[in-house]
Amino acid sequence: MVKRVNLALQGGGAHGAFTWGVLDRMLEDDSLEIAAITGTSAGALNGAAFKAGMARDGRTGAKQALDTLWAQMGAVGDLRMANWIAGFDAGPLLNVLKMAAPFSPLEAVSQAISPYSYGPFYRNPLRQVVDRFDFDEVCADTGPELYICATSVQTGKVRVFSGTDISTDAILASACLPNIFQAIEIPDPETGARDAYWDGGYTGNPALFPLFRHDLPDDLIVVNINPLVREDVPKTAHDIQNRVNEISFNSSLLRELRAISFVQRLLAEGTVERGRMKRALVHMI
């Protein structure tokens, strides 16, 4: 018997490689079918690769697409990627550096220099990876539904891209940390005005609400790569900023999980008539 589930893929730089491993294992289980994916930042990249591969050659294609994605990510030779690739933790190299100084040199540079200071020489190093996606496959009707989350700079609200609205710029917007990359401008579908977007993690890491349709499965698996709990209180400037980032990028997810819990309680108590609101069974990896 095939079990249909939805996936919610968090962002977190190279920690997204953990999600790659989770997806690779799921693809080996023929009893599991992915109905829909919502993703932010690295989760958006993983989701796009998964969807494109499934559209091209089913489970085998998805495995190959994920392998290719992370091979390309590892080959990006740009110092600005150091902070993004490391996610919210500085990683082994920067951990060595921070022992010799109260701050990370690369982090200090990224905080002091605006991405707009590069002038005409600016290039987003992620574009060379995202441009290689076949968007006929990413936006195909076959395979799981895909939702990509980004944050509007002007309104501070989440925008969810789906269907043919998913593009190179939509994925770059979802992964746009503003101290590293220039905001990504995308036309508003209603007004035509070009709106600026930053990383989706600020408002939806990832957004869960696109999955609350009655035609989608009740089961939702959240692949969590940002620690919800840390036992130790951070003391160094780096560790403090690291924890602030973790809390900030988890806050939107926690709000939605609390809302889900509230609705499920109302359904269980009979306060809300069954069928009027979505039943949700949330699992976390």
Task: Please provide the spans of the model-predicted regions.
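Gly/Ala-rich beta-loop-alpha elbow adjacent to hydrolase catalytic centers
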Residues: 39, 43
